[in-house]
Amino acid sequence: MLPARPEPLPVDPKTTAVIVIDMQNAYASPGGYLDLAGFDISGAAKVTHEIKGVLEVARSAGMTVIYFQNGWDDGYVEAGGPGSPNWWKSNALKTMRARPELQGKLLARGQWDYELVDDLTPQPGDIRLHKTRYSGFFNSQLDSVLRARGIRHLVFTGIATNVCVESTLRDGFMLEYFGTVLEDATHQAGPDFVQKAALFNIETFFGWVSTTADFKGTFGQLAPG
């Protein structure tokens, strides 16, 4: 049983995937998109460290590890034009419109901003998926990848708790996946209350909330079987 709020729940490593949401330079490194857009990323380094430890345990326990990278083609066709709400609400797109010298640099595949942070390089057997909107289920292969492997439980880490983490967990709930977020392996985009609100939403309506210590304590002694 994995200790969690609002109650502990059974988690079988063979049917569990750890989802790493958007641990890219854009969201976790100084000079990345979130930093340039004025968001506080001071907690990102600790989150990176926590995720690294979680992934070591997850792999040893035989869990599937899935990395997401958020962004678009270098021409931003996938981002949508003015006819898309994403064009209006994406802070990356708004930042580039306000600062034309950044055009083509933020969240574009092939650019430093898009790449995963150095400390979270995927290992052999890990899966890497691309997404173009907040939810990892939108226009991606995630659902088919999970179903093909018999995955029923998703453990979420990454940035930002209140945006892409929560969006993906919510969509997973609608598709009958059990979702748990490791609260100290996530970081919000915005003030501290946003993190608390997102975690409240998750544990009350859409899933469960646990910690990296409880995850590692539950699965750290397991070997794949």
UniProtKB/Swiss-Prot annotation:
One of its GO terms (biological process) is uracil catabolic process. Keywords: Hydrolase. Pfam families: Isochorismatase. It catalyses: (Z)-3-ureidoacrylate + H2O + H(+) = (Z)-3-aminoacrylate + NH4(+) + CO2; (Z)-3-ureidoacrylate + H2O = (Z)-3-aminoacrylate + carbamate + H(+); (Z)-2-methylureidoacrylate + H2O + H(+) = (Z)-2-methylaminoacrylate + NH4(+) + CO2. One of its GO terms (molecular function) is hydrolase activity, acting on carbon-nitrogen (but not peptide) bonds, in linear amides. The active site is at D22 (proton acceptor), K131, C164 (nucleophile). It is an enzyme of class 3 (hydrolase). Its EC number is 3.5.1.110. It comes from the Bacteria. Belongs to the isochorismatase family. RutB subfamily. HAMAP family: RutB. Hydrolyzes ureidoacrylate to form aminoacrylate and carbamate. The carbamate hydrolyzes spontaneously, thereby releasing one of the nitrogen atoms of the pyrimidine ring as ammonia and one of its carbon atoms as CO2. This is Ureidoacrylate amidohydrolase RutB. It comes from Caulobacter vibrioides (strain ATCC 19089 / CIP 103742 / CB 15) (Caulobacter crescentus).
